[in-house]
Amino acid sequence: MITLTHYLILSAILFSIALVGILRRKNLLMLFFATEIALNAVNIALAAFSKYYGDLTGQLFAFFIIAIAASEVAVGLGLLIIWYKRRGTIDLDSLQSMNG
C-alpha cells in the first residue's frame, strides 16, 4: 500500500533533483526544465496531502499551479527563442552582457 510518506519522499527527491538542476546548470533551457520539475514535485505533495486529508483544496492548488506553469513555459520559451536568434546562445553567462 502506498502511503502519504511514499508520496512525500518522491516529492522531496524530485524537488532535490530540481534544486540541484537550478543551482548547477548554465543553460537556460535546462533551468526551465528544472523549474518545471520543482513545480511538479510541489504538485505531487499537494495532491498527496489532499488525498490524505480528504479535501480537494490541494488538488485545486495543483491544478492552478499546472495552469501557471503552462503560461510560464509559453512565455519563457518565446523569450528564449528570441534570445537565441539574437545572441546565438542560450547560456546563462550570455545574460551578463545585457546593456541597460
Swiss-Prot record:
The chain crosses the membrane at residues 2-22, 29-49, 63-83. Its EC number is 7.1.1.-. It is found in: Cell inner membrane. It is a multi-pass membrane protein. GO terms for cellular component: NADH dehydrogenase complex; plasma membrane. Keywords: Cell inner membrane, Cell membrane, Membrane, NAD, Quinone, Translocase, Transmembrane, Transmembrane helix, Transport, Ubiquinone. Coiled coil: none annotated. It catalyses: a quinone + NADH + 5 H(+)(in) = a quinol + NAD(+) + 4 H(+)(out). HAMAP family: NDH1_NuoK. This is NADH-quinone oxidoreductase subunit K. It comes from Nitratiruptor sp. (strain SB155-2).
